[in-house]
Curated annotation (Swiss-Prot):
One Gene Ontology cellular component: plasma membrane
Natural source organism: Francisella tularensis subsp. holarctica (strain LVS)
Record-linked InterPro entries: MTH938-like_sf (IPR036748), NDUFAF3/AAMDC (IPR007523)
Protein name per Swiss-Prot or TrEMBL: 13 kDa major membrane protein
Subcellular location: Cell membrane
Pfam families: DUF498 (PF04430)
Keywords for this protein: Cell membrane, Membrane
Length: 123
């Protein structure tokens, strides 16, 4: 379990705690992978089990928020994504960082607290 330091985060949505597969945000608790913008949890249809199951529809959802930064938390360990994911994001002219999910939660919190337009998929 990783409890995230709450340094007076002023963002509408942020992580309070992360335990493998369980996310406690300031707005609720979730037991499935999340897609977030800087301001909300985004609803999606196709199930995400791992980095291999991220689909174009998930990336389209994130890209529609016009983020300056995209984070993808790949689970317990940092994993390399399928090339299709990198290509789709690159075609949109966005930067993306892949990291372990606990690190992605911390990074998301730091960026939203700086009022950065960040979106993420956290597995």
């Amino acid at each position: 379990m990783m409890t995230l330091q709450e340094e007076k985060i002023q963002a509408p949505v942020f992580f309070k705690e992360y335990v493998k597969g369980r996310f406690i945000l300031n707005i609720g608790e979730y037991n499935h992978p999340l897609i977030l913008s800087a301001t909300q949890v985004l609803e999606y249809q196709d199930k995400i089990d791992d980095i291999q199951s991220i689909k174009k529809s998930h990336l389209d959802l994130i890209l529609a928020t016009n983020p300056e930064i995209i984070l993808i938390g790949t689970g317990e360990k940092q994993l390399l994504p399928p090339l299709e994911i990198i290509n789709q994001i690159a075609k949109a002219g966005k930067s993306v960082d892949f990291m372990a999910s606990d690190t992605a939660c911390k990074t998301y919190n730091l960026l939203v607290n700086e009022n950065r337009n960040v979106s993420c998929i956290i597995i």
